[in-house]
Amino acid sequence: VAENSKGNGGIFGWLARLTRQSQLDFFPVRHVLTDYDQSKLRSDVLAGVNVALLAFPQGMAYAMIAGLPVEYGLFGSAFALILGMLFSGAKFIVLGPTNATSVMLLSTFSTLGAMTLAQKAAVVPSLLIMVGLFLVVGAILRMASMIQFVSRTVVTGYIMAAAVLIMVNQVRNLVGFEFSPEDRAVSFVDVCRLTFFKLGEMPWGEWLTWYPIVLGGVTVGIFLLLQKRFAALPNVALTLVAGALLHWLATRISNSDLGVAMLSSPEAGGLSLNIPTFELEQMRMLIGAAVAMGLLCVLEGLSIGKLLAARQGRRLDANQEMFSMGMANLGCSVLSGMAASGSLTRSALNASSGAATQVSSLISGLLCLGGVFTIGQYISLVPKPCLAVMVMVIGYSLFSRKQYRIVTKTTLSDAVVFWVTFLTGLVFALDFAIYVGVGASIILYLRQAAAPHLVEYGFTEEGQLQELEARKRTDMEISIVHVEGELFFGAADLFLEQTRRFCADPNLKVVILKMRNARHMDATSCMALEELVRYMRQSEQHILVCEVKSDILQVMTKSGLRNLIGGDNLFEDVSTNPTMSAAKAVRRAREIVGTDKMKVSIYVDSFKQKKSREQEDKKSTK
């Protein structure tokens, strides 16, 4: 045993081989620093300052969305930027808290029951370390491509449900009330119910009740004006400063605090090492949210990263970026941060500001971190209603009419998946909505892929293909069946049923299956085809298989189907001569039938045949 362990390296040798096979670079920033010069530094400093001016107030807003102290959003923004720069292979993705992950945190806290601020903060490290491990392990196993199974329709439904929850959940911070510890606001429905109940208890006859609403309305007006006139400025930060000044003037004029809650400044000891607790029951409750949050991080980050990389003619290493997100979340788990994902707005701003390398993220992170310790004490001067309305504006910005139109008007399947995800996100916890949406999209896809439609075609006197009317064959015939699409387990029974239906004609003697466009044959489809062969032999009919590609042939060989069909009745595809395999099959069919006078019918997928005709018509009109 000792020799065996020594020979193969044991667990450490296996891990070393796995990391080599992952093709990850565990310190990619060294490639940037080797030829770093002054011109790149100037570009990175400019971009870094611009991103920091946006990331700082957004970090506060995302902390409020999640129901955490503001320092979690600020430290999360800073350390995600710094760690992301160290492990990212490109400059395109700027990491930090986002709307999607903040709402996921809020939803996770809600499912855990009544929690104080300290209890929520205690859960974050355990949750983030699970998210980070999920992303790191996924990157090592090169699983970034698996994200394609979460469709953009699911993400759109989730984002819009999250936007609604964000806006409704900020009503309490705007008006000035809190839910009791016994209230469980798990979903949008719960938040609406509790909010309406609390609004009914407010003393609307007193003018102080209306003051925070008026202050919030004026704050929104200032922001919209700044956005219209000075869109290039850091308007979120400027608006919060303006709101704080307005409230300060109002308190001086009225000589009272006006009963408005203020934000709390980051605590002096807010930055500390948080050691996650690994309790089995807590991990069981958090695992679903951790996986969903990990999927969201990769989806958000890779979406904006691939877009920005394509604009510059570059290619994004998805697994490397997934690894950087994982390391950022692991770092934030012990450094009082929030979940780190790829930010759409900050990534776009970084690119438009002319960032030369990922060093711009390092500069942004250091500026945010410095801002916490220099101007962090002044955060307590910002009224909660001002930040609440800015969060509402951010939530409203998530609605996209274009995306809504695309996912609801393009296909019925997309519309169903969108509404299922959206409504589930309103009624249940948001992480559950992602799983339901993914499940619905996969089920609808399988239904489409598992529903082949075979239509009989024949040649007219002019030599044109046309659909044949239902009739009895009068001569011995050969039927050529074009097998196209997926031959996985979901399609096997339907294919067998439809094939047996036309094989029931006693005048039919030979069926030729053309397998060139068949894909992903599995054990279930092999057993279905085996059943078809035995059924036809009992009816003294023959089945030939042609244009069999190497992967399909390998499956047939391993399953024993190749021997059952027989070497004389199976013809491999010849890539250099596409028609040779089918010609051999027709020649073999003539030998079986024993005459050259026979009527040949062809079966194809009606939808694909129609699509092919449409493409040919388009070519002929050009």
Regions found by a protein language model. Give the residues of each.
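Cytosolic C-terminal regulatory domains/tails of membrane transporters and channels
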Residues: V1-P28, H453-K622
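Transmembrane helical cores of multi-pass ion-transport proteins
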Residues: A2-T460, D475, G560
